């Protein structure tokens, strides 16, 4: 019977597995949310491109982006809410197993850094160009399709 007991995962191993699963969920959430935000921005870009060439300007581009601000905010808020749920579950698992919460702190820090970098990147795309070259559209399409190269 000692062989059966030794093959069963220990509480520590189970905790490690749960934490790894939470990290995986966070990564999936971020990938899904990024794709959603890029898609919303791409729809704003399509709206901008639907204007005749002579009407395409940075003002028109920004206006198209602003028309999507509600969608962008809702997507961001949904992502933040899901992230908060995952973090609460991860911290609870760590506490219940007498573990240090530094891995959760690090996950939260990384999430915030990635979120801020994405917001900065999207803002940069929204407030640049407007010259009708299509550079922003190509960039957004690549990211919305998930062909992101780090």
Protein language model features and the residues they cover:
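Soluble, non-transmembrane alpha-helical interaction regions
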Residues: 2-150
């Amino acid at each position: 019977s000692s062989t059966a007991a030794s093959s069963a995962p220990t509480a520590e191993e189970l905790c490690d597995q749960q934490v790894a699963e939470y990290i995986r969920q966070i990564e999936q959430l971020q990938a899904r949310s990024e794709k959603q935000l890029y898609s919303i921005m791409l729809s704003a870009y399509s709206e901008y491109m639907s204007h005749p060439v002579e009407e395409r300007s940075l003002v028109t581009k920004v206006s198209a982006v602003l028309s999507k601000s509600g969608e962008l905010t809702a997507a961001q808020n949904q992502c933040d809410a899901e992230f908060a749920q995952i973090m609460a579950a991860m911290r609870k698992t760590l506490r219940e197993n007498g573990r240090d919460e530094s891995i959760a702190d690090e996950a939260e820090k990384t999430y915030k850094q990635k979120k801020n970098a994405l917001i900065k990147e999207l803002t940069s795309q929204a407030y640049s160009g407007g010259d009708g070259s299509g550079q922003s559209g190509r960039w957004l399409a690549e990211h919305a399709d998930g062909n992101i190269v780090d």
